[in-house]
Amino acid sequence: MLRDIIRNLSNGFVRFKGQTIGVVDERGEIAAIYKGIPQNDIGIRTDVIDNVPKSEAMRILVRSMAPQIIACDEIGSKEDIEAINYVMCSGVKGIFTAHGNDIEDVCKNPWMAQLINNHIFERIIQLNSKQKGDSKCIIA
């Protein structure tokens, strides 16, 4: 799902101009870079940093690529949260994923709880892995 969001925001669609996206792909699960070329379709305005720790990659993207949006999968460490604060304070929007059974489960991680309680996010969407298409907007 994250890859589809990235591709659509990057390419644009009817009445929505594509945005420059910076993808943090620490383990190569989003873009699947091979010899410098994404093997997955992630859009025409997308730059990728792979095989670099997420926190470092986010800072590099902000400083050197000037993306409008940064996308990163599986956040949760203290370093990730500090980097997200840096990204958001730099005026860059973000799309981030975190794994958990529900929002309460995600908030058991003290760093994630801090990020959520500081109202860094404009919107949090909870997906239900047991029932396809079932989602709930927590913050809007």
Locate the predicted segments by residue.
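Glycine-rich phosphate-binding P-loop
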Residues: M1-N11
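Short glycine/serine/threonine-rich phosphate/pyrophosphate-binding segments
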Residues: L2, A31, K78-D80
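Short, conserved beta-strand edge motifs with alternating hydrophobic and charged residues
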Residues: L2, I21-E26, A71-C72
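Generic hydrophobic/aromatic pocket-lining and core-packing "Φ" positions
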Residues: I6, M58-R59, I81-I84
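P-loop NTPase switch/communication element
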Residues: S10-L61
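Conserved P-loop NTPase nucleotide-binding/switch module
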Residues: A66-P67, A71-I125, S129
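Long C-terminal interaction/binding lobes of large macromolecular proteins
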Residues: K132
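N-terminal cationic and glycine-rich segments that engage phosphates or anionic surfaces
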Residues: A140
